From Swiss-Prot:
It comes from the Bacteria. This is 4-hydroxy-tetrahydrodipicolinate reductase. The lineage of its organism: Bacteria, Bacillati, Actinomycetota, Actinomycetes, Mycobacteriales. SUPFAM superfamilies: Glyceraldehyde-3-phosphate dehydrogenase-like, C-terminal domain, NAD(P)-binding Rossmann-fold domains. Belongs to the DapB family. (S)-2,3,4,5-tetrahydrodipicolinate binds at residues 133, 142-143. Gene3D superfamilies: Dihydrodipicolinate Reductase, domain 2 (3.30.360.10), NAD(P)-binding Rossmann-like Domain (3.40.50.720). Its main location: cytoplasm. GO terms for biological process: diaminopimelate biosynthetic process; lysine biosynthetic process via diaminopimelate. It catalyses: (S)-2,3,4,5-tetrahydrodipicolinate + NAD(+) + H2O = (2S,4S)-4-hydroxy-2,3,4,5-tetrahydrodipicolinate + NADH + H(+); (S)-2,3,4,5-tetrahydrodipicolinate + NADP(+) + H2O = (2S,4S)-4-hydroxy-2,3,4,5-tetrahydrodipicolinate + NADPH + H(+). PROSITE patterns: DAPB. One of its GO terms (molecular function) is NAD binding.
Length: 245
């Protein structure tokens, strides 16, 4: 398969360039970064693209890719419900094209979200702390937002988090994502980390994942690239590829 990388000069993008070059069954067809024309992808007969760019440009990238029939594996964050609906609308006009958007491609991170969903109904309280490098554009992270939504779904019909806080500074209790408090840390020296904290009478449970290097994303991204065209339309997350439903 001929694979292009968008955001090829970024830290994650450069890692993906090396990963594609090292994969015996993939051919690196294009390296595209800010200022380079997207037409490079069509001129090089690129079949699938890995996008690790920026929330400000990812929608324009996807519109181009979908209408040119190029499959996309997207690690760029910042996808609101409205953006997802727009992508689905574009894909409806190109039913054979596939887009996979994942908040996290690290296998351990995906498993931690799955474990959190399983644990959620058994605890009274749940909160999330996500920790990233200070260059990250969005807060809370896509992984934390998705984790919170999964926890909220698993706790549907149960009592909300107990919390007697009556006065606080703005933001002190974190962002509220479907009733789950999410706290974002931006600190030099970090890459990507998340803790999910559960509590109930007499015990707590912490599920933590740490990406210590951006190569942690490579196995998940390459899995998605190899299988994206099997799933025309929109796929959210790599859970279906890991049989985690």
């Amino acid at each position: 398969m001929r694979v292009g990388v968008l955001g090829a000069k970024g830290k994650v993008g450069a890692t993906m360039v090396s990963a594609v070059e090292s994969a015996a069954d993939l051919t690196l067809s294009a390296e595209v970064d800010a200022g380079d024309p997207l037409s490079t992808l069509t001129e090089t007969n690129t079949e699938a693209v890995i996008d690790f760019t920026h929330p400000d440009v990812v929608m324009g990238n996807l519109e181009f890719l979908i209408f040119n029939g190029i499959h996309a594996v997207v690690g760029t964050t910042g996808f609101t419900a409205e953006r997802v609906e727009q992508v689905q609308s574009w894909l409806a006009k190109k039913p054979s094209t596939a887009v996979l958007i994942a908040p996290n491609f690290a296998i351990g991170a995906v498993l931690s979200m799955h474990f959190a969903k399983q644990a959620a109904p058994f605890f009274d309280s749940a909160e999330i702390i996500e920790l990233h490098h200070p260059q990250k554009a969005d807060a809370p992270s896509g992984t934390a937002t998705r984790t919170a939504k999964l926890i909220a779904e698993a706790r549907e019909g149960l009592a909300p988090n107990p919390d007697a806080t009556s006065t606080s500074l703005p933001g002190a209790r974190g962002a509220d994502v479907d009733g789950i408090p999410v706290h974002a840390v931006r600190l030099a020296g970090l890459v990507a980390h998340q803790e999910v904290l559960f509590g109930t009478q007499g015990e707590t449970l912490t599920i933590r994942h740490d990406s210590l290097d951006r190569t942690s994303f490579v196995p998940g991204v390459l899995l998605a690239v190899r299988r994206v065209r099997e799933r025309p339309g929109l796929t959210i997350g790599i859970e279906p590829l890991l049989n985690l439903q």
